[in-house]
Amino acid sequence: MEGSWFHRKRFSFYLLLGFLLQGRGVTFTINCSGFGQHGADPTALNSVFNRKPFRPVTNISVPTQVNISFAMSAILDVNEQLHLLSSFLWLEMVWDNPFISWNPEECEGITKMSMAAKNLWLPDIFIIELMDVDKTPKGLTAYVSNEGRIRYKKPMKVDSICNLDIFYFPFDQQNCTLTFSSFLYTVDSMLLDMEKEVWEITDASRNILQTHGEWELLGLSKATAKLSRGGNLYDQIVFYVAIRRRPSLYVINLLVPSGFLVAIDALSFYLPVKSGNRVPFKITLLLGYNVFLLMMSDLLPTSGTPLIGVYFALCLSLMVGSLLETIFITHLLHVATTQPPPLPRWLHSLLLHCNSPGRCCPTAPQKENKGPGLTPTHLPGVKEPEVSAGQMPGPAEAELTGGSEWTRAQREHEAQKQHSVELWLQFSHAMDAMLFRLYLLFMASSIITVICLWNT
């Protein structure tokens, strides 16, 4: 008796499989005797539940069309190091089951009902870019209409791979893809289509977007494609998700403080070099900028080379260059006030060229030289008193003459030294002004270049 029962069950299975393989199926109407005010009797749908392992078609050569749609309710995170987009989606799939139908007039006016999704055949739609295990909650339900249309919705936390371009950080826009496809069914068995238009999906996503953090949704677009794998074609729908970073956090915490520090470094050129305060001030400012970069390093992407990193490198280079310039000018002043060598002729010519009106830098009005200078006897047109012939100086007069000549030579030496010191001081101030202008020019051109690159 037990063996005959087994053979009967096996015969029924092979008979059903034969009908499916031959392209023939059976449609039927659900008996409404199990319908009432408390819902439907599960036994009335047993014939549908028993077909759950098989694709619901009456002709196996006809592919099942699955319409998909989704709404993005949250952009959770964008991992620049791993190139991952974490989002939360509400996925909706709609398809027809020809084995389900009933007459609403005979079934208490019921046009649709909900039933456990585990009792129905479900499309194996997945996201190709998904980089984590599907964490869809269990025990979901699906809505079934009296015409056999099934509407199934499920929430999904999606960690998808996304090729991020962080060069324009923090003013960057990213384009990520979400590709929906079947894992098992080829184009001969399943076709994908849209349940809603793209603009409807975009508006719905913007309306229910619950996160107002670092990223905002710009828009969605879609494309259809066919994936060839192992000689089989799989239908696909590719959604392009455009998102944009909100840069206010990084502008306030990174760009503005860095700009202030560079501006203070530029203003420090107005500190007099002779006071000795410019070098310590610039060293303190440089150390403070390095501490600032160390504290803010957690806000920067850890992969790639963003443009903001180039901006910080330029700011650091400007500060180091200004410190070296100050050290150079301080050394010139030290040389000028201790043992100034004779100023080379070409430097003297360059200094005269720069001191001329409208040249390299404005010069202070020349002060009258009140120090020891040339004696009147060395001025043009003035001759030394001649000694009368036949008048030989005596010993006392010779001693006085020798002393006056030594004093005159010493005065000439002091005058030449003072003149050399003044020339070196003028040269130092001219170099300081010229290097300051070069500093401003390089700073302005660098900042303008970075801003133009950010705006492209």
UniProtKB/Swiss-Prot annotation:
Membrane-side (Cytoplasmic) residue stretches: 270-282, 329-433
Transmembrane parts of this sequence: 249-269, 283-303, 308-328, 434-454
Record GO terms (molecular function): excitatory extracellular ligand-gated monoatomic ion channel activity; serotonin-gated monoatomic cation channel activity; transmitter-gated monoatomic ion channel activity involved in regulation of postsynaptic membrane potential
Family: Belongs to the ligand-gated ion channel (TC 1.A.9) family. 5-hydroxytryptamine receptor (TC 1.A.9.2) subfamily. HTR3E sub-subfamily.
Note on domains (UniProt): The HA-stretch region of HTR3E seems to confer increased conductance to HTR3A/HTR3E heteropentamers compared to that of HTR3A homopentamers.
Subunit structure: Forms homopentameric as well as heteropentameric serotonin-activated cation-selective channel complexes with HTR3A. The homomeric complex is not functional. Heteropentameric complexes display properties which resemble that of neuronal serotonin-activated channels in vivo.
Protein name, as recorded: 5-hydroxytryptamine receptor 3E
Organism: Homo sapiens (Human)
